[in-house]
Every structure is written in structure tokens, then in C-alpha cells.
Amino acid sequence: MLTRMKTASLQGVNGYPVTVETDLHRGMPGFQIVGLADTTIKEAFNRIRPAIINSGYSFPREKVTVNLSPAGKPKEGSHFDLPIALGILLLTLGEEAQTEDTAFFGELSLDGRINPIRGALPLALCARKAGVHNIVLPLQNCEEAAVLEDVNIIPVSDLTQAICCVKDPQTTVPYKKKKRVEEAHSDLDFSEVIGQEYGKRALMIAAAGDHGILMMGGPGCGKTMMARRIPSILPRLSYEEQLELTGIYSVAGMLPEDEPVITSRPFRSPHHSISMAGLIGGGQKPRPGELSLAHRGVLFLDELGEFEGRAIDAMRQPVEDGFIRLNRNLEEIIFPSEVMVVAAANPCKCGNLWDEKKTCTCSSAQISSHMRKLTGPFADRIDMHVRVAQVAGKDLKEQEQENKGMTSAQMREKVVEARRIQEERYRGMPHRENGWLGESDIIRYCLPDQDGQELLRQAYEKMGLTMRAYWKICKIARTIADLEGKETIGTPEVAEALQFRIMEKEMRRNGA
């Protein structure tokens, strides 16, 4: 006797289809699971047997063999409890059921209740891609998965309810979403930032082209305040991006109960003591790190020079590629990491190096050591470098007169329009923002006109720029032109873009 139940297993933040085959045959009573199951799945017998008995059913006296197909791929997760238990019950009761169009996920407690699971949305997505139209999930996970279209999400609270769904599918009622998916309102607005018009302009350019940006300035000048307001000017998440982000947070076990669908772009600000695994992801059972949790949003690295060197170096490739590739137990796991990196740092240990009103107490050796940390390979990959000064007295006076400059709503309008232009230009390409272009695409789309190229050539020689910096200036100039609605990149756009690499030369000189 044999039953087959459809389910799925996670591989990173994605799933792949799994068929649970359950067989009863004569022999010594026993329970065996084959198919590269992890410890959690192998322990399933100790949950399934009491759950079946405490639900009023009898556990078979025959030998039970469970095969997880495909047998050659590693599998993990307690959500296999439900399909295994249902397969055993169908064989014990002698029932025949049509389960080809249904996938099952759920962890069993000893009394037969079905507990919530991690990764419900990516598992349900996998089932939908496999052609399944009915997905049975724990009740607590249904709000998360109900965002999916073209499938029926069927909630179950206990094993008895689940077996009824299998025996008599006509009686099941699909889950109806309770909450309307809307973007969470942000109380942070750029109009609250006094002065710093240069910094706000730089952040708007960075947001428009998805460029990384490094802000340097003394303590209290507003670096963190401005960084925390960046999500308020980024475009709203699309439906596909919401699914992608919700899946990442679901796998990480960080999906808020009151917000089962991620509707706002994430802002992650890890402490500088974070480990390499915490930053890029990993572990014995790989989980997304801060880079992936900030996917499609902002990763803010405050006090960049204080982060562990190994952790920062490990970010170089993922930040450029937009994904993290890990290898565990002969298995390749990929986590997404398309983030806007925003870093902040003081120019020296005391923070007063560039302050005209305060005296720097650092020695030349301390300044050089600090600057070397900020001019390494990772910082070189950040497109824009911005010097943030202390707020001037005249800016305070303008604030009193309610001359607050642009609001986040006004800045977002410009950013959204610039992103729209880029999306049309790069239609059919892997990335849709200027910040992600490679050299060949930069040559095709981002070279300035003749006068602009001459200015850029002169700057390249006088400023001692690297070729990487040269290409980054072209990308920034392209974004500035998009913000201004210009098709051609001219001298004004190149001149403004050059401002965002001037600080690099000063940093290298101080670090020499």
C-alpha cells in the first residue's frame, strides 16, 4: 500500500517540489524515513505517532517507510510532519483521496494541533509554480500566503481538520485575506532635516540611480538622520517585490505577526560588532543575513571604520553582484542582496578633523590608520562619497522662517520619475537602475557628450582617478541627467558627478 502527498523543501529563500511517499508493509513494527532528511525530519516519528493517537486514530502496527523524493537532494524543516501523518492515516483508514492538486505543509504538536512554520510563502510559491492549485497551511501562516493569486489557501488547525480536507475536499473553505496590503506610513520626512541641502541632493541622486553612498562628517552633523529618511523617497514596492521580501523574512523567521506581508522597503542598520555570518548570511542551516534582509531597500552601515575587516571584505562581491552564493554540504544556496548601501563615518577618531570650529585631537598616525580603513576595496566600490558639514547658523534661521526645503513626497516624485526613465531604457535587462550597470552598458548608455567627455578626461588626469572611479562618475552623471529629464549627458551633469569623488582623493592623502 502506498500514498503520495505533495509538499516542498526550502533551498535558501526558494523552494523545490518534494513528493512524500508513504508505504505500509508486513514486518517488525518500525518507522523509517529515507531521502536525505535532516534531524528535524528524522525526529518526526516522535511527533507524528502521539499526534495521531491523541487525535483519536490508531497508529499502524506494520512497518512504515517514508521516502522523500527526489531522494538525492537534502531536505529540512518540520513542515513535513503534516504530509507524512496524512499519508499514514490514509493507509490506516483504507481511504482513497485525490491529492494530486494539493500541497501540504505543517508542523504537528503532540496533541494533534498544527503549528506555524517558517518559509510558508516561498513554499507556497514553489507549489504554485509546480501547478498545484490547493495549498493546505497552518492557520497562522494563511494571512502571509493569501497574497498569492490563482491558488486556494486552505487553513487547518489540527490533524482531524486536515484529514477531513483530504477525505472530503468539497467541505473545505479557502482562506480569505483579512488585511488589505498597503504601504506602511513613515513618520520620517526630509523636511525635518535642517540645512544639509548638498547632502539631501546627494541622497536623492543616490536613491534615483540605486547608487551606494558614503557620508563622512563629524558627530551630530545629521548623517544618521538623513540615512533613516531614505526609504521615504524610494519608489513603492511592486507586487513581485513584496512577495520576494516577504519570502526572505519568512525564511528568516522575522515576519511580524501584525504585518504578514512586507509592504515597505526595508531599512537595516546592523551594529558594527556583527559577525560575517550575521552580515552576509550562513550558519549550519543557512539563514539570510543583514544584506538579504535589506534586499530592495537600504543597508545602513553606521561607523563604517568600526566594522570587522573580514565582514566588510565579504560584502564586496555580493554588493556588486546583487546576490550571495554559499556552499553547504555540497549544496549551493543563493540569497538575494540587491541593496542600496549607505555608509557613514567620522573623518577621524575624535570626529573633528574637518570641523572649522573644533580642534582635532588625533595624531597623524591615528588619522592615517582611520582613513586606511575607509579607503579599502569595499569603500572603493561605493559610487558616491559625500562630505557632510555641521549645520550653519543661517540654516537655523531659515528653519525658523519655515523654509524647510523639499519634502520626502516631493523628492520621491523626482526619484520615481527618474526610475521610470531607467526602467524604460533598460527594459529586458537584468537590472533597471543606473547603479547596477556594467562597463559595457555604461559605454552604451552613460557616456557624456563631447564637452562632457573632455571635462571628464581632464579630471581623470588631474585627480588621479582609477578606471573604476571613471565608470562610476559616468553612472552618476547619467542619473543626474535622468533626474533633470535630459537624454544627453552634458558638462553640468559631469561637473556635479565629479563632486561626489573629490573627497576620495582627500581621504587617500590623509591615509597615506
Give, region by region, the residue ranges found by the protein language model.
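Peripheral, non-AAA+ core regions of ATP-driven protein-machinery
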Residues: 1-214, 221-224, 262, 327, ...
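Short beta-strand elements
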Residues: 18-24, 279, 383-390
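Basic, amphipathic alpha-helical bundle interface domains used for macromolecular binding and assembly
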Residues: 37-45, 60, 67-77, 286, ...
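Catalytic P-loop NTPase motifs of RecA-like helicase/translocase cores
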Residues: 111, 301-308, 351
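P-loop NTPase nucleotide-binding/switch module
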Residues: 167-205, 209, 236-291
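Walker A/P-loop
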Residues: 214-256, 321
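Walker B catalytic acidic pair
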Residues: 296, 302-303, 314
